[in-house]
Amino acid sequence: MSANIDKLHDDHSHTPSGIMRWITTTNHKDIGTMYLWFSLIMFFIGGLMALVIRAELFQPGLQLVVPGFFNQMTTMHALVMIFGAVMPAFVGLANWQIPIMIGAPDMALPRLNNWSFWILPFAFTMMLSTLFFESGGPAAGWTLYPPLSLQGGDSMPFVILSIHLLGLSSILGAINVIATILNMRAPGMTLMKMPIFVWTWLITAFLLIASMPVLAGAITTVSYTHLTLPTKRIV
């Protein structure tokens, strides 16, 4: 009887294996590793776009691509590098180091941590797919200001939705960081005893929560103008 019980309960973790382990994981180290790998992949994609830009600017005149595609590469390079390479890299380091530095077993909201990561691949798949649209990808420059944002064809609403999803991911991650730092420090570790890396992320998280809704409002107005302005097709 006891042998049968031991056989049935020899593994108490019951964790999924294979790809499901990475899809469903709530371990802060696993999620941090996925953030870092995702950042590296986006860095290579953004780097290829930068190579196209630099090759075109190698000397005066048209070299490799038409001006419209050059503008698309400039816009996508900015979005990929900022939201796909730089920010996920720092979030990956935060997932790895913050719980260890403050003596916490994991992030305060592990499932939210998983969700905030898996938003990124879907958002960037949608964003990069606009390059294959008949009207081409967004060609609004780094700032997405009108009037350039009004001539992006059908790709602009998809790009704006992607930025909304990326902002949602950032807000969820910032909430998780704040909850972890304020509630899961080791006994005796006051705010003044925290490492500077943890302090940096605590301040950054508050700034993200304050700034991302402003960005969301700005790009929402751009989307509204793009969809409703009768003269949105500028030639």
Task: Describe the residue ranges of each PLM region.
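Conserved small/polar residues in nucleotide/adenosyl-binding loops
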Residues: T225-T231
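Membrane-interface helix-loop-helix modules in multi-pass inner-membrane proteins
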Residues: R54-I178
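Alpha-helical transmembrane segments of multi-pass membrane proteins
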Residues: L40-F58, T130-E134, V214-L215
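Divalent metal-coordination and catalytic microenvironments
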Residues: H28, H77, I181, G217
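Early transmembrane alpha-helices of polytopic membrane proteins
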Residues: T200-S223
